[in-house]
Amino acid sequence: MVTALEARPEAAEIWRWLDEVPDPEIPVLSINDLGIVRAVDVGGDEVVVTVTPTYSGCPATAVISLSIEEALRRRGVTRARVKSQLSPAWTTDWISPAGREKLRAYGIVPPEGAACAGAAVRNAPQACPRCGSAHVEEVSRFG
């Protein structure tokens, strides 16, 4: 049985809760750090969280949705829905500054600035995330 919200949380509070939901592929990041949460809407007796996956076929999308729903249930939200929004497409530009720092410490340096400017644009990492050396090369566009 689906019941109404036990307590009507504010959207800002839900955003804070989502800071605790890790990305299943890179668990040092929250889904907020990654920038995939696009909107939180509290209306009536339902919370709707809109998510843009990092790519349209992302295999972690179902796990992320379940994790969001579980995080909300733990706080008394009994009616939640996760909506997928594919457009505009996610870019590394959406990663938060805190998320970029966490990735750097984890050994990953995502592209910076105008990531969607075009396929021909390739921004090499600025520095090695481990030692800070400027002698770096891109190893992989994906993962």
Predicted regions mapped to residue ranges:
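Domain-level signature for proteins that mediate thiol-based redox and metal-cofactor handling
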Residues: 1-143
